[in-house]
Every structure is written in C-alpha cells, then in structure tokens.
Amino acid sequence: MPESTILRVMVSAFLVLETANVLALYLAPGSRRFNAVGVFAGWHASTRDADLHAFVRYLVFWVAGTKVIFIGLWLVILLVGDARTQLVASVAMVPAIATFYWRLFPIVRRLDRNGQVEPTGYSSVLGWMIAGFLLAFVVAIAASV
C-alpha cells in the first residue's frame, strides 16, 4: 500500500468515527453510544432544570458544531490536498488529539471514580481508545515519511 494511502485510510477512519459522534450529539445527545453524553449523570440531572438543560444542550451542540468544522476541513485536505499537506495536517493532529489528556481526561476520570459515569470504567475505555488513535496516527505518519 503506498505511504500516502495508509495515511488517507487512517484519516478516513477517524472521520467516519467523528461523523458518527456528530450525528449522535445532534440527533441523540442523551444516547450512550459513540461520544454522546448519556453516559454522564450530569446530563440526566440537567433535565430536571430547563434552563440548565438548555445550557448543557447548547454546549453539546457547540461541540458537535466544532466537530463539523473539523470534518469539513479534513475532507478538503483529503480531496484536494497533496501528500505533503495531508502529512503535515496529520502531524498537527497528534498534539491536537493529545490535548484530551490535559483537561478532559482528568475530569472524566474523576467523574467515573465518583460514580457519575455509567458504565463504570468508561473513562479508561475512552482513554485507551484515544491513545489507540494517537498511536495509529503516529504509525501512519511514520509509514508516510
């Protein structure tokens, strides 16, 4: 498989996952599938306060919207970008994805430990899944250099 094809396949798989996440966030934010927020007790607690729930929904849809922008940019990079542009954009993805461990992972881990996430252990699964994507990006980048 040509080097740039490996990278394109990796990015395409990531975009499929992100598209599923966007659909879940927009169409079924309370779902427990993909990265919808139904796994969080706070989502369910917010439904008891209309103003708080409106704010939480706003934040969920804001996240979905930023993912749509991200997906759109990556589609342009895949469709019209040359191999070098795709490589450099993929290199930029590694630290961007890794920011999950800076702010989000400590929060979701604490919520998980405090029984605010169902199923228990969700934070570990999410952490390992993201680590897997990071590793896959690094391998695809290395194969493309």
Model-identified regions with their sequence ranges:
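Hydrophobic transmembrane alpha-helical segments in integral membrane proteins
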Residues: 2-23
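Individual transmembrane alpha-helices with interfacial aromatic-anchor signatures
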Residues: 118-131
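Juxtamembrane helix-break-helix junctions at the cytosolic face
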Residues: 72-95
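Juxtamembrane boundary at the C-terminal end of a transmembrane helix
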Residues: 136-145
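Physicochemical signature of membrane-embedded alpha-helices that form the seven-helix bundle of GPCRs
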Residues: 10-13, 59-66, 89-95
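Hydrophobic transmembrane helix segments
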Residues: 16-53
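Core segments of alpha-helical transmembrane spans in multipass integral membrane proteins
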Residues: 38-78
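Transmembrane alpha-helical segments of integral membrane proteins
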Residues: 99-114
